[in-house]
Regions:
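Amphipathic alpha-helical packing segments from all-alpha helical-bundle domains
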Residues: 111-162, 170-183
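C-terminal peripheral helix-coil segments that are non-catalytic and often amphipathic
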Residues: 128-131, 166-228
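Hydrophobic alpha-helical connector segments
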Residues: 60, 71-103, 110-114, 121-123, ...
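Short, hydrophobic secondary-structure boundary micro-motifs
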Residues: 32, 105-108, 142, 193
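Short amphipathic alpha-helical elements of helix-turn-helix/winged-helix folds
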Residues: 18-22, 96
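Generic hydrophobic, amphipathic alpha-helix propensity
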Residues: 11-19, 36, 61-65, 69, ...
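Helix-turn-helix
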Residues: 14, 22, 26-56, 60
Length: 228
């Protein structure tokens, strides 16, 4: 027998799928309580048991679409080349933004800024990929700086490509943007002290938790010094 909680979850899932489909295909203006309720096979008042209004529904719909995207990224097994994995993740993210302009616009709208679970998970996946590069001695900046540079460049690239007039579209812009970021954050080869001290520092910070001779406090202090 289905419990009340299960029925509620099933109904909410129907609403979310209906709202997400309208958002993806027709944009925020199409996500009205009446249209969503019709698509979900419900009466409009039923939606207010789950959402306070249209803005709440829009945010939830955008989060639903992005959560599906992030979940698909988690199923991708890492390769032996962390830099190529980073490039593949970049391409996937750019493709998602271009294929879902309405969703991307809502997620990045400063007036609606929200730190959602899916966004946090997406940043974590990126941070893990950057961490693998640092562990390989290929990172010339801090992991935090690398993550922020990649995110900034990715958001800017998607926004630019979405707003360019068709006659000015540049199919190679995303690749060029990644290459520019890569030059800024990557060492050409695993670093040695005489080649790239910044990359050595980034790699050494990865090893700090594994140094048995240091206490947690000592490791934290050394990490603070290395960040400077």
């Amino acid at each position: 027998m289905t419990s009340n909680a299960q029925r509620r979850d099933i109904t909410r899932d129907r609403i979310m799928k209906a709202a997400a489909a309208l958002l993806r295909d027709h944009g925020p203006a199409a996500v009205t309580t009446r249209r969503v309720a019709h698509q979900a096979g419900l009466q409009p008042p039923a939606l207010y048991r789950f959402f306070q209004g249209k803005d709440d529904l829009l945010d939830a719909a955008a989060e639903h679409v992005f959560a599906e995207h992030v979940a698909s990224k988690q199923t991708t097994a890492p390769s032996d080349d962390p830099v190529e994995d980073l490039r593949a993740g970049w391409n996937t993210q750019i493709s998602f933004g271009l294929a879902n302009p309405y969703v991307y616009g809502l997620l990045l709208d400063p007036a609606r800024a929200r730190h959602t679970p899916a966004q946090a998970k997406g940043v974590l996946i990126l941070a893990e990929r950057v961490h693998r590069i640092a562990a390989a001695g290929r990172l010339r900046v801090s992991e935090e700086r690398a993550v922020n540079l990649i995110r900034s460049a990715g958001i800017g690239t998607v926004h630019t490509l979405l707003t360019l007039p068709p006659e000015q579209s540049d199919p190679h812009l995303a690749d060029a943007a990644f290459d520019a970021v890569a030059r800024a954050i990557l060492a050409d080869q695993p670093a040695v002290p005489t080649q790239d001290p910044a990359a050595v520092i980034a790699a050494f910070r990865i090893l700090l938790p594994e140094l048995p001779s240091l206490s947690k406090a000592e490791a934290a202090l050394l990490d603070e010094w290395l960040r400077r």
